[in-house]
């Protein structure tokens, strides 16, 4: 699949490459879309001649960096968008949905997969679990914020507290499962790649709304043409295939 996607991206970039010289393009994005972007950057660089300097972090942390005025040619943020557009740091008209990503449940490889088909089934699974791990929402992790809201909606947030092992990032949560330190793990589906775990599935939409990720062009982009090339690439039909491969839904 990777070869196919890369070929499509190379063709798209060859058609859409700008006439300007090579430039460095800076990008900032949350961890939920990190792996998809990292997968695509080499093909963009080869085909466009530009280079990309990418910064990744928590959903809240990266958004705050943009809001405070740090300049990244292509910022990728999660809603609400009004907080970002009100700062004047981004071109409001450039707002484009790139992808959405859902919170998923994972277990250690070879372990039974619990039923998560309904809200009641998820509640039963969580109450029966001895330990769970997921990214720390208090530190800005969007997956953690989302799952905290799910537990509150289910009415079990306080009851679950003694069982929770909060970590920094989805990869750490998956590693804890693979090592047998916790029974269940949750993070964005796009972050589950550890060979020691297996995906059970995504949480039902009735208790967990997928997180949307929007791209912008910064008002102070160092090379507007190069920024536009990367921005258009990340929202292209070819890139949509990469998002799907990584467990995300394309924004358009």
Q: What is each model feature region?
A:
Residues 1-5:
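Positively charged n-region of N-terminal signal peptides that target proteins for export
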Residues 6-16:
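Bacterial N-terminal signal peptides
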Residues 15-23:
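Bacterial Sec-dependent signal peptides at the C-terminal "C-region" and cleavage site
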Residues 22-70, 77-88, 94-101, 107-252:
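Exported/periplasmic ABC-transporter solute-binding proteins
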